[in-house]
Structures are given as structure tokens and as C-alpha cells.
Amino acid sequence: MIQLPPTPLHDLNPAFHQEFSSMSWSALHAMPSTTSVGPSLKEVNTFSQHKSHSIFHHGAEIEQQNKFRQEKVIISAPLDYLGSLPGKDIRGKLISAFNEWFKIPEEKLEVIKRVVGLLHVASLLYVHEIQHTHFEPSLTKPSKSLYRIDDIQDSSKLRRGLPVAHNIFGVAQTINSANYAYFRAQSELFTLGKPQALDIFTEELLRLHRGQGMDLYWRDSLICPTEEEYLEMVANKTGGLFRLAIKLIQLESENTMDCVPLVDLLGVIFQIRDDYQNLQSDQYAKNKGFGEDITEGKFSYPIIHSIRKDNGNSQLMNILRQKTEDEDVKRYTIQIIESTGSFEYTRQKLISLTAQARALLKSLGVDQSSGLASILEFLELKQ
């Protein structure tokens, strides 16, 4: 084998050495800013590798960041779509109203709003859009005609007058986006810097899913709950995000006032009002579809009262079993519910609950011109 003599340092390409002044080395933190000794061959080779690695690493990092941003846009698309739909943002207003008392820093309040907002949108995607999808038990793969949409759980085809997310992005992508939102919300909690925040988050999500589980069980098993069972379920499910928000606010505040009983009451008012509007409001029908609780087969507050008042109300139970989309059948169903005095009973229940909430506000020393008083006024049924 022919042995080549080692190449002397002065025979190496001089341009390579001239390319990097001591200033260049210093800027890249490869050596001190001034030196009286020129780089040795070993130093030159080391720097060359360092520069190549740095450039490659920087480029790869930028590429990875761009890829992550693109993936985030794709994964979050159903969330962003639903979040862009017009709405009253009652939860955000409620959080701001409670902070009139607790006065936590605005940056902390915004974190709590983001957490609750993400969980709310996730619940709309997953609880309402996905879990309300019905499949024929004899089929292993559902066809398009078998999707019942209220977002997937409620059977509705509209949300705020526009198509539900899973009709645009598909069921699988919508499920994934909802789960992604749960973990994004959880990651936001770490910015609060309070270990107890994660305990509160976990406790309330467990309660929320327990409530939702019972709601689905009654619907899918065609079991009509008692009024007391329904109110307990609502306190767990609908009250969950309200309770999460107020507990996180209280965690950040020096104010020791306990507002959880008030929040629980507001959650019940909110849900019963929604049940009533679903079957009685023209605007609700325009935004979400006519009589969607009937199509879903849901045991809502007025429906439960009607069934219990009429000794099981076999007609109403049979209609719920059918999960009908026929508007004439749904109009007849509403007549049945009206005939048992169930809408009037629901109105009176809301009046009673609202009076209790006002009394609680007064006992807490809340001004009637406050944000919370305004929210209660908004929740009152307008005849």
C-alpha cells in the first residue's frame, strides 16, 4: 500500500483559515474574542465540525418548529372552527363577574378563562358531537345515515346556525381534537404555579364525566330518572366547568368567600333553562335544530316531569325510543309535554331557583348592579 506523506499545515487551503477571523470565532463562542495564537489544525477541524453541526442543528430546529406549527393547525382545526362560531361566552362573562369580588391578577384570570374555554369546546366536540352519535348494534361500521348529530352526542346538525364540526372534519379527527384540548387545558394549569390546581382540575373533570355518563346511560337504556337524580347529574355535569373556574379563582385570591353553592345553583339554572329552550324557543330551533332533545332521545327536565306526571307516559317513552327526526312527530311530542303542565312546571322551577340565587347574592353582600346580577337577569326566561 502506498503511504502518502502527511499534508503540511501551510499546504491546506488558505481560504479556509482566512474565512474565520477571531471575531467570527468569538461571535460563535468557539474561542475568546482575542488571542495571540493562531488555530491549530485540530482547532480548525473542531470548529468546522462545530459550525456544520450548529448550522444543521439550527436548520433542523426551525424545520421542526414549522412542522409543529403545521400539525397544531391541523389537530386544532375542529377546536378553532367551533371557537370561531358566534356565541354569548356566558362562561367567560361569569368568570369576569366573580373576579369583581376576588380581584386576582388579570394574567391569572386569562389562564383560567383559557382552561375553561378549552374544556367547554372539548365538551361540545366530544360530549355533544361524538357521544351523541348512534350506531345500529348489528353493524360494526356505521354508515353516514346512522350518525345522529347534535354535535355527535345530541343528534343535532347545527351549532349556532352552522354545521357541526364533525360534519366538516369527520368523527375521528373531531374526537382527537377534543382529547387534545383536554391536555392543552391541563398544560395551561402549570402557568398558575399551584400544585392544588391540578387536583381541582382532576376532581371536577371526574365529576363532569360521572354526570355525563349517567345522562348517556339513561338515554341509551331508556330509563327515566327521577327529578332528584336528574338535578344531581346536572350539578356534576353542567356545574363542573363553573365550579372548576371558581375554585381556581379562589385558589389565586386572598378572599376566602365560598361561592361554590352559588355556582352549583347557577349550573342547574343554566341546564334547566337550556332544556326548556330546546323545546320552546324559535331562536334555539334556528341555531341548533327543532326539538333536538326529542331526536336525541334525551330525558330533559320537562320530559322527565311529563313522564312522571302521566304514570310513565308510554307514548312519550315510545317516541323517545324512536329518536325521530320527523318534525310533525316532534310537534305532537311537544303537545304531550304541554298537556301534562310540564313547561309551566319548568318555568316555575326556574323562577324559584333564580330567587334562591338572588337571595344567595344578597347574603354574600353582592350589589344588584354587579356582573353576577346581570348574568342572572340574562338567564331569566323572557315571556
Curated annotation (Swiss-Prot):
It holds the Pfam family polyprenyl_synt. It catalyses: isopentenyl diphosphate + dimethylallyl diphosphate = (2E)-geranyl diphosphate + diphosphate; isopentenyl diphosphate + (2E)-geranyl diphosphate = (2E,6E)-farnesyl diphosphate + diphosphate; isopentenyl diphosphate + (2E,6E)-farnesyl diphosphate = (2E,6E,10E)-geranylgeranyl diphosphate + diphosphate. Mg(2+) 3 binds at residue 274. InterPro entries: Isoprenoid_synthase_dom_sf, Polyprenyl_synt, Polyprenyl_synt_CS. The keyword Transferase applies. One of its GO terms (biological process) is mycotoxin biosynthetic process. Keywords: Magnesium, Metal-binding, Transferase. Shearone derivatives produced by this cluster are interesting candidates for Alzheimer's disease (AD) therapy since they moderately inhibit aggregation of amyloid beta 42 (Abeta42). Dimethylallyl diphosphate binds at residues 159, 237-238, 271, 278, 288, 298. Its cofactor is Mg(2+). Its EC number is 2.5.1.-, 2.5.1.1, 2.5.1.29, 2.5.1.10. Binds 3 Mg(2+) ions per subunit. GO terms for molecular function: metal ion binding; prenyltransferase activity. CDD domains: Trans_IPPS_HT. Geranylgeranyl pyrophosphate synthase; part of the cluster that mediates the biosynthesis of shearones, diterpenoid pyrones (DPs) which are structurally diverse meroterpenoids consisting of a diterpene linked by a pyrone, and which may exhibit a range of bioactivities. Belongs to the FPP/GGPP synthase family. This is Geranylgeranyl pyrophosphate synthase esdpD. It comes from Penicillium shearii. The lineage of its organism: Eukaryota, Fungi, Dikarya, Ascomycota, Pezizomycotina.
